[in-house]
């Protein structure tokens, strides 16, 4: 177990670098879906900012007795301002994404020295701030969908040792993870594309190989100079392709601490949505990449499940998302008009 992030107030960088022969409990506690928070706040659902002794602070891991609101403010504040409850929740949930996915991915690259990692944790037994990826009422947090990418049997992984790379020279190890040996005997290309805060391409590099029996393979390092990392945001998109098809996509975001809220202020693009029963097709019809694209069913977060969410869509790209409800759904994203 390791709780230096959260109980010891460690920076998120700590979780980016942690290693262990086997992982149990770790990560960052985060707020539930906003519908769930408003549900347990009851008559205080429209009160913000939070005040000492209110419902909001009581619904924390030790009922507000261990400075939990300060910890929430610290980790949420790496990403978002605290002007509104919605922004505070978003920042908290993004901190959980970073605090979990990087640790899991580093652990996978260390096989067999690291033999496993428990997914701490799936659900919860109390409505409030928690390490869970599904809150007490059943609403799914963003970390669930990012961990889907991190735990995919076939994926490309970049390792980071810090969250802020701005104006620094960096060398990022790139790994190919192929648990089921899907690429065995096949040629493949792993491409890494880096975007800045204008969503201009900074670097695009391809790593070619031929699949063997390895489940973990280091492909090399992605090197960036100070000019290339000088940006209020950097995004890294890792695609694994073989036989003319993209087989997986993983993506990362850094430098967000430069300015609170910057991650949600990227140049905008446009997404269309087409529904056929429980199958949702989302398409980027704009001229820029679409970041963090997700579908949801307003008012039904406690029932709603998507097959995948928080997608990166390049211009012209489409993805099909399966949902489990017949209720109305909508599409949102971090830079969607």
Question: For each predicted feature, which ranges?
Answer:
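A structural signal for the main folded, soluble domain(s) of proteins
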Residues: 156-158, 163-167, 182-188, 217, ...
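Intrinsically disordered, low-complexity Pro/Gly/Ser/Thr-rich segments with frequent PxxP/GP/PP motifs
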Residues: 188-190, 195-234, 301-327
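Intrinsically disordered, low-complexity Ser/Thr/Gly-rich stretches
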Residues: 247-250, 254-261, 292-318
């Amino acid at each position: 177990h390791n709780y230096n992030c959260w109980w010891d107030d460690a920076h998120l960088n700590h979780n980016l670098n942690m290693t262990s022969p086997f992982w149990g409990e770790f990560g960052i506690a985060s707020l539930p879906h906003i519908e769930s928070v408003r549900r347990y706040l009851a008559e205080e659902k429209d009160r913000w900012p939070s005040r000492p002794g209110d419902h909001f602070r009581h619904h924390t891991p030790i009922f507000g007795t261990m400075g939990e609101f300060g910890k929430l403010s610290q980790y949420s504040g790496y990403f978002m301002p605290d002007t509104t409850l919605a922004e505070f929740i978003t920042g908290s949930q993004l901190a959980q994404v970073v605090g979990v996915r990087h640790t899991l991915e580093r652990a996978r690259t260390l096989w067999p020295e690291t033999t496993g990692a428990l997914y701490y944790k799936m659900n919860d037994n109390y409505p409030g701030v928690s390490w869970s990826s599904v809150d007490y009422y059943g609403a799914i947090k963003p970390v669930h969908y990012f961990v889907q990418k991190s735990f995919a049997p076939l994926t490309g992984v970049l390792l980071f040792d810090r969250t802020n790379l701005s104006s620094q020279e960096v060398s990022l190890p790139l790994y190919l993870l192929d648990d089921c040996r899907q690429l065995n005997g096949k040629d493949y290309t792993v491409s890494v594309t880096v975007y800045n805060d204008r969503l201009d391409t900074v670097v695009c590099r391809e790593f070619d190989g031929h699949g063997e029996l390895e489940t973990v393979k280091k492909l090399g390092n992605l090197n960036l100079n100070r000019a290339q990392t000088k940006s209020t945001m950097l995004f890294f998109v890792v695609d694994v392709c073989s036989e003319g098809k993209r087989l997986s996509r993983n993506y990362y975001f850094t430098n967000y601490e430069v300015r609170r809220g910057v991650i949600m202020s990227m140049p905008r693009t446009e997404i269309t949505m087409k529904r056929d029963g429980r199958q949702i097709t989302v398409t980027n019809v704009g001229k820029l990449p679409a970041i963090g694209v997700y579908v949801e069913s307003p008012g039904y977060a406690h029932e709603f499940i998507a097959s995948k969410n928080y997608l990166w869509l390049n211009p012209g790209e489409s993805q099909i998302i399966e949902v489990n409800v017949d209720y109305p759904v909508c599409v949102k994203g971090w830079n969607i008009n």
